[in-house]
Amino acid sequence: YVELWAHEVKTPLALLTLVLDNRRDTLPEAVGFKLDYVRNRMQAFIDQMLYYARLRGARRDYRFERLALRSCIDEVLDDYRPLLEEKHFRVELRLADETVFSDRRGLCFLLGQVVSNSVKYALEKPVLAFSLENGGTATVLSIRDNGPGVRACDLPYVFEKGFTGDSGHEKNKATGMGLYLAREVAKDLGLTLTAASDWGAGFAVRVTFPVV
């Protein structure tokens, strides 16, 4: 059922993409931006549904290979550009050239859920910072925002399915699925996800890649 639903929804999404690709020069800039925004939101919801169904199935279809981590991050930021621009994010990249062993599609989905979470809870003058630590046995990617953060009592549950916590007015719009799906995909990819936060001072997710 999920796959059928996604297939049906992708038809109008493909039409919207075609219009944007072929008619962008004739559209007012504000209209093009809004259509980009809607398209990316629709695609994000479809991806979440498909990954949820995929995680519950027997087949995963991952393809592990050496990946340039910066390339994956750039791809995710490009996908989320309309949402980041809508909230006026400043993105900081403090990254050395680093390769990791993973599945590109799965890794990009995981990173996208973290970015989406930061966008959802953004405050004024939002910042999204990516940094990298390279140790002897692991490479750690940190993704930090300056949003409202998470209370200490809630922090152990941020990766639980359906958990929305208490992070301001966006709580009622949250599904509690993004970080849950990120953690489940991370498990499949052999990665570790951890979260850190000070209430009122931002939220960070650390993705640990074992060195292989």
Q: For each of these PLM feature ranges, what is it?
A:
Residues 118-119:
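Short helix-loop "hinge" at the ATP-lid/N-box region of the Bergerat-fold HATPase_c
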Residues 150-163:
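Short conserved segment of the HATPase_c
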Residues 145:
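Acidic ATP/Mg2+-coordinating residue in the GHKL
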Residues 125-137:
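Short beta-strand/loop element within the Bergerat-fold HATPase_c
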Residues 83-93:
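Short conserved segments within the C-terminal catalytic ATPase subdomain
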